[in-house]
Amino acid sequence: MKKFFAHSLKNLFLSTTALFAASAFANNKLYVYNWTDYVPSDLVAQFSKETGIEVIYSTFESNEEMYAKLKLTQNTGSGYDLVFPSSYYVNKMIKEKMLQPIDQSKLTNIHQIPKHLLNKEFDPENKYSLPYVYGLTGIEVNADEIDPKTITSWADLWKPEFKGKVLMTSDAREVFHVALLLDGKSPNTTNEEDIKTAYERLEKLLPNVATFNSDSPEVPYVQGEVAIGMIWNGSAYLAQKENQSLQFVYPKEGAIFWMDNYAIPTTAKNVEGAHKFIDFLLRPENAKIVIERMGFSMPNNGAKTLLSAEVANDPKLFPPAEEVEKGIMQGDVGEAVDIYEKYWGKLKTN
């Protein structure tokens, strides 16, 4: 989950063409494009040892960065074999014919995915994607500075006593999601007036904001640089392992529900390898490693039975069903993404 990340197309083109040579797509190589810190490196090495497939692993920091690079690789006839877009980008990429169907018959471990996380509106029947990790964005509080019992709403971030103490994720849709929710508007609105009003609300928050961070949002909390703000539930889990004073709060208006997914681009050369890598990560013993090491809620029935009771029952790592139900998932806003980006740019330069 993550952020708007502006790149010049020139730089993207140069980096992309440099990355992919004509011989790069032999079946013994698999080009994976994923979020930072989403798969432990030793698991990647284990996959290569088992299959003989060399994984060329690259990372991105936002859906926008991933999408822009895939657009360029479509035009050059090269590209990645496996990508991990968020739900609203899956829908966008399906519409633009950027993804090919996943052959579920090749996935012996697909039954490990809980059924209630399948068949979502952004990809009915999961023809083009499967859930990798999911979670909720809520509020982190340092109990040494702030009583967590006094924090119940997203609106609490605007309290004047929190000047210079707030962290917001560096993700336009997430940040505007909060303001739109407080304004009583849909977080997926395409109405510019609604987005502008949300921007004006966020302007008033800026004196409180110490940083925008979507790289490792748990770090500023652990290091005491901020005392309250946005955080993903998995990052909150990792943060509390470092500092027991950090508490995670689900806001009464609802947290932000997100899901990042396996998807195979239409330009993929090693489609067989992509399926093998998906199935490898769906193994319960491997999913367990991802959950424990990375701190993300990986939907895997078998993995949950392998976890200690303390981890399996942690409400940060595995959000309660009522909070998931209350959470609102981001949807594709079409061309209105440019409106969000415009006001996001204004907000970040204030």
From Swiss-Prot:
| One Gene Ontology cellular component | periplasmic space
Q: Sorted alphabetically, which keywords does the UniProt record give? A: Periplasm, Signal, Transport
One GO MF term on file is:
polyamine binding
- Signal peptide range in chain numbering: 1-26
The protein's predominant localisation is periplasm
Q: Name one Pfam family in it.
A: SBP_bac_8
Q: Name the InterPro entries for this protein.
A: SBP (IPR006059), Sperm_putr-bd (IPR001188)
Coiled-coil residue windows: none
Share an example GO biological-process annotation for this protein: polyamine transport
Cell compartment(s), UniProt: Periplasm
Q: What does this protein do?
A: Required for the activity of the bacterial periplasmic transport system of putrescine and spermidine. Polyamine binding protein.
**Assigned protein family:** Belongs to the bacterial solute-binding protein PotD/PotF family.
What is the name of this protein?
Spermidine/putrescine-binding periplasmic protein 2
